[in-house]
Amino acid sequence: MQYFEWHLPNDGKLWKQIKEDASHLRDIGVTAVWIPPAYKADEQQDEGYATYDLYDLGEFDQKGTIRTKYGTKDELKKMIDELHKYHIAVYLDVVLNHKAGGDFTEKFMVVEVDPKERTKALGEPFEIQGWTGYSFHGRKDKHSDFKWHWYHFSGTGFDDAQKRSGVFQIQGEGKAWSEGVDSENGNYDFLLCNDIDLD
């Protein structure tokens, strides 16, 4: 059962609500619950698809809040334990292909491409300033000390120096769009935030 929808309030109560509903879910025959992204997004009111920190489940003071839109890490763990008590599986929605809400800007070379034809460059390479630096200050290296930089991404959607949106393919050795996406309109997979380079 999907236990969320796009327009839930930003009140931090979803994990508590699901926990309180666990026995009822069992009684009506629910055997699995699909929950929204539990980690910190770029803003508290975000549904969780603008991924900021996969290691922050509502535990650290980052992006102006400790809890996520849905609650705290402790509430999440209690909710999962309660569902498991009633033999209900939990499926977590996770976004692994992009990051949002960088902590600092970096300068790097890009080529702007046609948003409707990603394989078509609109000019020569040039330098932009993008929000591609992730240091996760509030987490202080707990769970992971990995820091993200521009070279971990294949594209970005905003040049902070010019305050301009676009589809910017990051340049460098081995940098390219993913091959395995729909070829409609020339690699139609849309760019959201900072596209993680999975190659």
Positions of PLM-derived features:
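Substrate-binding/active-site clefts of carbohydrate-active enzymes
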Residues: 1-20, 27-31, 37-75, 79-199
